[in-house]
């Protein structure tokens, strides 16, 4: 809102593209950018990277506060398995099935967050890079389980587990 204590204009833009290289192989690009004006914002309004769905793989355990920035995620994925799990029929009903698709992937991320008052956060005002490999399991209602092993420029690596649904 606008009053004497808080004055902020925000613009956040995101885009996604997917291109098939073969029937089971594709490239995904996801870009995100944002800016908050004026740059001098109270700490509460400086939340940027690491909150909710706005994060970079390999930096899941970090938050980077700032007023402007963005990132690009690139993924090369291939469908490895596609099968159905059969559920026994119930009384008066036909047998049902749960579709399962498993994808192998490699990915890379690059991003930057500008913070005019970085304080103790040494991840602001520098390029952040990470890469890794992973497996995505896609099932009913676009429920996705992601198992990702990431490496970041801080010399850290680890296995990260994610779950995403449309609900």
Question: Predicted segment positions?
Answer:
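Membrane-embedded beta-strand positions of outer-membrane beta-barrel proteins
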Residues: 15, 29-31, 74, 104-108, ...
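Outer-membrane beta-barrel transmembrane domain signature
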Residues: 75-85, 89-91, 95-132
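Transmembrane beta-barrel architecture of outer-membrane proteins
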Residues: 8-12, 69-71, 128-132, 142, ...
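Transmembrane beta-strand segments that form the barrel wall of outer-membrane beta-barrel proteins
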Residues: 1, 29, 57-62, 106-111, ...
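Residue-level signature of outer-membrane beta-barrel architecture
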Residues: 17-19, 76-78, 137-139, 149-151, ...
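Flexible, surface-exposed loop regions and adjacent strand-edge segments
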Residues: 10, 44-53, 121-127, 163-167
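C-terminal outer-membrane beta-barrel translocator/porin domains of Gram-negative envelope proteins
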Residues: 1-94
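Outer-membrane beta-barrel "beta-signal"
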Residues: 72, 156-167
């Amino acid at each position: 809102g606008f009053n004497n204590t808080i004055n902020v204009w925000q613009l956040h833009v995101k885009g996604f593209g997917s291109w098939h290289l073969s029937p089971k192989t594709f490239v995904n690009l996801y870009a995100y950018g944002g800016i908050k004006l004026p740059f001098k914002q109270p700490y509460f309004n400086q939340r940027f990277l690491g909150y909710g769905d706005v994060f970079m793989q390999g930096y899941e355990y970090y938050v980077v506060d700032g007023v402007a920035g963005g990132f690009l995620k690139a993924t090369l994925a291939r469908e490895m398995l596609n099968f159905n799990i059969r559920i026994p029929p119930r009384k008066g009903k036909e047998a049902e099935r749960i579709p399962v698709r498993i994808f192998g992937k490699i990915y890379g991320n690059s991003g930057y967050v500008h913070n005019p008052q970085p304080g103790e956060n040494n991840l602001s005002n520098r390029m952040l890079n990470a890469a890794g490999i992973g497996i995505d399991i896609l099932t009913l209602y676009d429920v996705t389980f992601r198992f990702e092993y990431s490496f970041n420029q801080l010399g850290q690596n680890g296995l990260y587990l994610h779950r995403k649904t449309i609900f």
